[in-house]
Amino acid sequence: MPITLDQQYVISVGDTDVVSINYTDYLNSGELLTGTPTVAEVTTAALTLSNKIINTSTYTEADTGDTVAVGKAVQFAVTTSTAGAYRVRVTCGTDATLARTKVVDVLLEFK
């Protein structure tokens, strides 16, 4: 089973929000994410997941204040009309000489 991130997102039902998964701590020095990330709901099919990308500009994490460099995070939009807790699996390859695939789960709670 993949690592489940400590950070849990709380989103209002009906909102469309952007979720950003920072892989910086999982990547080696100089290693970047590459390819098209896979973002899939694990437990149900109630979420609409769209715009799945590797970040193309730096951003600052709201909860930590950390600046995330280009190519170090996967971002996607999510919405639902059903309250509940959801598990989403995020998978992305890297550009390492011996390419790796990084997989994490993130918990989303819609209220």
Identify the meaning behind each predicted range:
Residues 98-104:
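Extracellular and select intracellular beta-sandwich modules with Ser/Thr-enriched
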Residues 91-95:
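Beta-strand-rich extracellular modules
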Residues 1-31:
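Predominantly extracytoplasmic/ectodomain segments of secreted and cell-surface proteins
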Residues 105-111:
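Short beta-strand edge segments in extracellular beta-sheet folds
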Residues 64-75:
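Aromatic sugar-binding surface patches on proteins
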Residues 79-85:
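Surface-exposed, short loops/turns at beta-strand junctions within beta-sandwich domains
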